[in-house]
């Protein structure tokens, strides 16, 4: 089109357009579940099930608009690359179980759920390949000669030297099972968040089964959500990545066009990042208790 007919809208602040279309590369999803159910045995009932699943995709459409969906897909060369990888939502193993014991008017139920908490990728925090998009998967150098660090400074103060960062980076590779990717780009969504075990407990007591001979019932209940965390503050806590899309470990120094880039390691608080995840000890993941009252008529 004649570009003279298009003007920049300063009210919106946008100067580019993203056009999405269907890909010719097809993904797939597969899952299988097996288990057993205990209907009733001496007041006990329950079930246990295991699910295996696998899914591969070209993109997870990681965004709320066309532009962010396009640029949010981590890649090697360009967001326009169409290649199939494990889905961001592909959690391979999941176990769920429940066991309930009923005796007269009392019921005690235990519920368990165990699974990895998701997938993530290692990537650079900024644009490394010069395509204008900060979505580049991380390359693990074969040796120290393939990566160059620069000091991290604050004013005239050196916070971390280049050698300290190199040592920390090599330790990160060893500690997080990345040695096998030496000389390679890490796969997108190739890593699992830690396994999480969650146990819930419910105790209920029926006080009156037939109030005023009308069949009305009164029941009180006590629910412990994430009961394991009540027993041990480290149990049942979820983990999340140190970065929004996964684990950004390195940041490129200088402009995107630099042919021989230098890097700095990112920090987690006041220290150099040492793990791709951290525990999320918030009210959303710690234990809670609920007292319930139910009147049935």
Show where each model-derived region lies.
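Aromatic-acidic/polar surface patches that form glycan- and anion
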Residues: 23-29, 37, 85-92, 185-197, ...
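Extracytoplasmic gating/loop element in the C-terminal half of outer-membrane beta-barrel translocons
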Residues: 107-212, 219, 246-278
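Gram-negative outer-membrane beta-barrel transporters
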Residues: 1-120
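Alpha-helical packing segments of well-folded alpha/beta enzyme cores
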Residues: 32, 95, 198-202, 289
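Outer-membrane beta-barrel translocator domains and adjoining extracellular loop/strand segments
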Residues: 59-65, 121-127, 233-238
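Outer-membrane beta-barrel proteins
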Residues: 38-42, 103-108, 203-213, 218, ...
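Gly/Thr-rich phosphate-binding loop signature of adenosyl cofactor/nucleotide-binding cores
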Residues: 224-226
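Outer-membrane beta-barrel "beta-signal"
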Residues: 284-297
């Amino acid at each position: 089109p004649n570009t003279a007919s298009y003007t920049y809208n300063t009210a919106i602040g946008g100067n580019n357009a993203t056009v999405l279309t269907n890909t010719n590369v097809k993904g797939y999803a597969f899952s299988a579940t097996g288990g057993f159910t205990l209907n009733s045995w001496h007041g006990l009932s329950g079930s246990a099930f295991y699910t295996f699943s696998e899914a591969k995709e070209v993109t997870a459409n990681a965004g709320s608009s066309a532009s962010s969906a396009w640029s949010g897909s981590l890649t090697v060369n360009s967001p326009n690359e169409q290649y199939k990888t494990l889905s961001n939502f592909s959690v391979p193993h999941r176990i769920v179980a429940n066991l309930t014991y009923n005796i007269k008017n009392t019921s005690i139920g235990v519920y368990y759920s165990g699974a990895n908490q998701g997938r993530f990728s290692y990537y650079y925090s900024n644009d490394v390949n010069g395509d204008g998009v900060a979505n580049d998967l991380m390359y693990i150098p074969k040796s120290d000669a393939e990566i160059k660090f620069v000091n991290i400074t604050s004013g005239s103060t050196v916070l971390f030297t280049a050698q300290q960062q190199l040592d920390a980076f090599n330790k990160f590779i060893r500690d997080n099972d990345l040695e096998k990717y030496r000389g390679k780009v890490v796969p997108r969504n190739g890593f699992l968040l830690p396994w999480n075990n969650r146990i819930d407990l419910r105790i209920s007591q029926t006080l009156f089964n037939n109030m005023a001979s009308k069949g009305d019932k009164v029941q009180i209940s006590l629910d412990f959500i994430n009961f394991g965390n009540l027993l041990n503050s480290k149990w049942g806590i979820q983990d999340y990545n140190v970065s929004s899309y996964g684990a950004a470990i390195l940041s490129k120094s200088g402009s995107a066009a630099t042919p021989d880039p230098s890097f700095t390691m990112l920090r987690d608080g006041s220290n150099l990042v040492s793990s791709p995840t951290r525990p999320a000890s918030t009210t959303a993941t710690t234990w809670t208790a609920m007292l319930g009252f139910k009147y049935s008529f």
